[in-house]
A protein has these predicted regions:
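N-terminal signal peptide
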Residues: 2, 17-42, 67-73
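Intrinsically disordered, low-complexity cytosolic loops and termini enriched
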Residues: 35, 41, 45-50, 57, ...
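Classical eukaryotic N-terminal signal peptides for Sec-dependent ER targeting/secretion
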Residues: 1-16
């Protein structure tokens, strides 16, 4: 080829081969169990006097637990040193809830904000709350809703006044649309160890615009968009603590009312081209319970024309070949799996198991004792199940996988890390699992995710157009 060097030709072939491999990875039948053993910190909590917990200068400076909530904005220093977190505040993403904690004095639940740095055109007031847990006192927790925001716009905001004032910024997501590109990060079972810090530092290099947490933010029970996990339950009657999920409910607001949910434990949001559903394994979900009825209606309301990517978050995996917590998600699978297949859910993320694992597209909805079909079977309409419970918890990694590796398991490894899902358009997204490896983010499991709805929808549309064309010709004869 004139004007093209041999090196360029080789590079093109390499890229093409790589794409063909990634594009066909869903069809591979041989699962992989990685034997990799990387460096890791001891699974112990970071001491409270560590610099990541240092209070910023200034009297009564706002602060918050540095394990933030969905979505992630700004830069690493913002996350690790200022402890203010935000979460989506409504159904479509043009509202945010800003949360922080003050100690000593309650201060004011007020946020000044605008689209120019240090020029705050608007003021929003929120509410302050606090709670106790045995001998622990939470401090003063502030939640302020900023709504009617412009899409795809950078906002600057200020919390506090005088010496205690702190200034930050966030970026609102693009307007909802079928071909809006967007990059999500996924982290589960983060905890507050040195491995947790390593995961966050690696994650900050990923370029993700928002982070989806899969539960177990803290392990203080021995003390998220955000999903609740078993370590948030905190039901301890021997300490006269009988309100489950107390800390979670006080600290991490969710926009559950916007999706007509009766509980902050399960809810849905739309962001860019994705419709994200968050479920609770630790709330009732069987037939006729509030969560069951809500999910049934929410799935019917999903608009795949505008949000083609349907993503479900939960804490306990429905499919896992790890010895730890084996089959714990079976009850929820038995109740909801058929719905997920019928509605062509693209991917389901879970945590709980402190390792990484990805499945093929499989389902077990044909299970019948009399038929002998006891095991999951390939199902093109089923979601891919991904366990990302390797954020850095204090309990260590779950390295005992079951053997032989089940046919439904595509890749599994017991290492700390995080994932990213980069939506490109209505039909394709790129997925990466990144292992924490010697100070670098290392992609180790990657594939192209094909949208479940649009390929069949396009075929049906072409068929309808063809039939109408044929009918038109017949009518004209």
């Amino acid at each position: 080829m004139p004007g093209v060097t041999k090196m360029q030709c080789l590079l093109f072939r390499l890229v093409l081969i790589t794409f063909v491999f990634l594009d066909s990875v869903d069809d591979v039948n041989a699962g992989i169990t990685s034997r990799y053993t990387g460096k890791e910190w001891p699974a112990v909590d970071i001491p409270l006097d560590h610099e990541v917990f240092a209070v910023p200068e200034g009297h009564n400076a706002p602060q918050q637990v540095w394990f933030f909530c969905f979505p992630l904005v700004a830069v690493a220093e913002y996350v690790t040193k200022n402890r203010v977190h935000i979460t989506q505040g409504n159904y479509d993403g043009n509202a945010v809830i800003i949360s922080w904690v003050t100690f000593g004095e309650p201060g004011f639940s007020e946020v000044q904000y605008g689209t120019s740095d240090k020029n705050y055109e608007f003021t929003a007031e929120g509410k302050m709350t606090n709670y106790t847990f045995y001998e622990y006192s939470s401090g003063y927790i502030h939640h302020v809703l900023l709504d009617d925001l412009k899409f795809d716009t950078k906002y600057y905001y200020k919390i506090g006044d005088g010496d205690s004032a702190r200034e930050f910024w966030f970026q609102t997501p693009p307007m909802i649309g079928p071909d809006v590109p967007y990059k999500f990060g996924i982290i589960g079972d983060l905890g507050q160890t040195y491995n947790s810090l390593s995961t966050l530092e690696h994650y900050m290099e990923s370029g993700a615009q928002s982070v989806l947490f899969l539960g177990d933010l803290s392990y203080a029970d021995r003390y998220q968009y955000n999903d609740v996990g078993n370590h948030e339950i905190e039901y301890m009657p021997y300490m006269n603590e009988v309100v489950p999920f107390k800390s979670f409910l006080y600290r991490y607001p969710t926009p559950h009312l916007a999706s007509m949910s009766s509980s902050p434990m399960w809810y849905a949001i739309r962001r860019a081209s994705a419709h994200i559903i968050v479920l609770s394994n630790y709330s009732p979900f069987v037939k006729y319970t509030p969560q069951y009825l809500w999910l049934n209606e929410e799935l019917e309301n999903v608009d795949r024309e505008n949000t083609p990517w349907l993503i479900v978050l939960m804490h306990v995996p429905m499919y896992s070949s790890n010895e730890e917590h084996f089959m714990e998600g079976e009850s929820m699978r038995a109740v909801f799996e058929e719905w997920f297949v019928n509605h062509k859910v693209d991917v389901i993320f879970a945590g709980h198991v402190h390792a990484y694992e990805r499945s093929y597209r499989i389902s077990n909805i044909r299970y019948d004792v009399s038929s002998g079909e006891r095991y999951p079977a390939p199902d093109e309409s089923a979601p891919i199940y991904i366990t990302v419970g390797d954020g850095g918890n204090s309990e260590g990694l779950a390295g005992r996988f079951r053997y032989p590796q089940p046919n439904y398991s595509a890749f599994r490894e017991a290492s700390y890390g995080h994932s990213t899902l980069e939506i490109m358009n209505r039909t394709h997204a790129f997925y990466h699992w990144n292992r924490n490896d010697e100070g670098k983010k290392v992609p180790t499991d990657s594939f192209v995710l094909h949208n479940q709805y649009w390929p069949s929808n396009v075929q049906e549309s072409k068929l309808r157009k063809h039939n109408l064309s044929v009918l038109g010709r017949i009518a004209s004869e």
